[in-house]
Amino acid sequence: MTARSHDLGATVAGVHLAFCAMNAPEALSLPHDLRRLVTSRTGAIVLRTATVHPFLHPEFRSLHNPGYDKLVPLVRELVATGGPPVVATIAGANVEEYGFLARAFADAGTAWVEANLADPWVAATVAPFEDPRTLRTLARRMTEAAAVPVAVRLPERTSLPYARVRDVLADAAVRIVVVRNDLGGLEKFVLEAGTAFDVVAVGGIHSGYDVRRALAKGAKAVQVRSALVEEGPGVFARLEREMRMARG
């Protein structure tokens, strides 16, 4: 790694990323698309949300996946390339499934495991933000099961105030929080929850300026969604180039 690549990197929960931008999990889902990220400038490779069993529910298309047992070998393959760190994203029908999935992906070599608590299916099944005890139990189950850092992705709105969410997640030893890159997400969370976590902002990234702006507002790194879908893996090189140009 050169000094010039290092200066746009990030350290998230002790994991070094060569670049502070990575893919959002919903942007790419097929194995061959994820493999293309290995040689890109992305800071990490984030897998599509995985569930215990194959998920094909017609009302929740955002969670469609072949099941964790098909994705664990992909994690091992990607890790073996020596490319960017690999991040697993998981969703469970109950607290036990979150713990099971966290252990399975951590053991496969992921850099951290992200609990997707933002999907409507999770709100309908686990409902982690209706009772802080549920959120605490879920988070603790994951941090106790996984030997790697745990991240929690928050929904657009939570019934619990962010300060309460901070207390619950910090008590459970969660180290990363993923929030929407907007006023009600990133800015409000940083304002109300402080600096207890490494924050990753997702969405709203179309230029190097957008990345710099998110970092200035308190994010450690960003996840790229629509720009990646439109441009492909080359978007990360463009974002990096634009950030360097802005620095002169």
Positions of predicted regions on the chain:
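Short His-Asn-centered micro-motif
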Residues: N23-E26, L154, V202
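Alpha/beta enzyme core
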Residues: R35-S40, A44, A93-V200, G208-V222, ...
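N-terminal capping/small domains of soluble enzymes
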Residues: M1-V86, A91-A93
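Flexible loop residues that form catalytic
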Residues: E26, A50, A118-P120, N181-D182, ...
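Short donor-sugar binding/catalytic loops of nucleotide-sugar-dependent glycosyltransferases
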Residues: I205
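Short, basic, helix/turn surface patches
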Residues: P73, R141-T143, R247-G248
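C-terminal helical cap(s) of enzyme catalytic domains, especially alpha/beta-barrels
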Residues: F55-F60, L215-A216, A221, S226-G248
